[in-house]
């Protein structure tokens, strides 16, 4: 069963903070989410397009995220647009700046998939960092991250059940339950203090939520309390979140759906739309783009070289 206690504590903490903090300076990323505000980017006037189309697209993406100023950003991409790769590349660049990074998603499978790409880029660039993957003890290792360096002396990402966190750790990967705020364990007089799970309360610089279209709004808020900046990665046109009940108003939406408000693509001044797919042939891409992505999705040059041989000579 899905454990809700930490998520309830997190939402309760946010509500109390919002009501009692007159400055509203804490949890700015979550505030931006619920108010559906424009991203706050350093050195960029609010309302301006986030990406300069005349410059290198990947470099522009990295620059925008680096300059995120206690705010929220959406990276939307159709299948084959490189959501995982660009997210991992951005994360590596942030780690190089000594930023504390979080990685989350609805499932451990999605988290591990992004971690594999992060590990691959770090090895290619010969960049070392220390990361942990927090798993449930009940999973008995089934959710563990298994990468190229796992179990070796050069291990980059260590699996843990969440009851210890190295001080020099720069990347933490976990589901909403682990990131959700929980009060520190109380000290009992005469007893040895217990070391509980790490308390994440804005001690991370960034959290990247992959497949954000599957993470409900409440969980997105709970995760957001752990960080100064929140990046939602996904595509509402792909798999939606699993729904087990009926929720009033916007409560049943994912964080991504809540921000897009029935728009097919994220506006130029609100987020980053990954415009090139390496998966779809031009004719197929044109149809998909016009039907679902406001004609913004284009086929990459590499797709021109692909052919599908159906071997239909006898038909």
Predicted regions span which residues?
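ASCE P-loop NTPase motor cores of helicases and related translocases
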Residues: 1-178, 296-315
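Conserved helicase motor core of SF1/SF2 NTP-dependent helicases
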Residues: 96-98, 107-112, 117, 177-180, ...
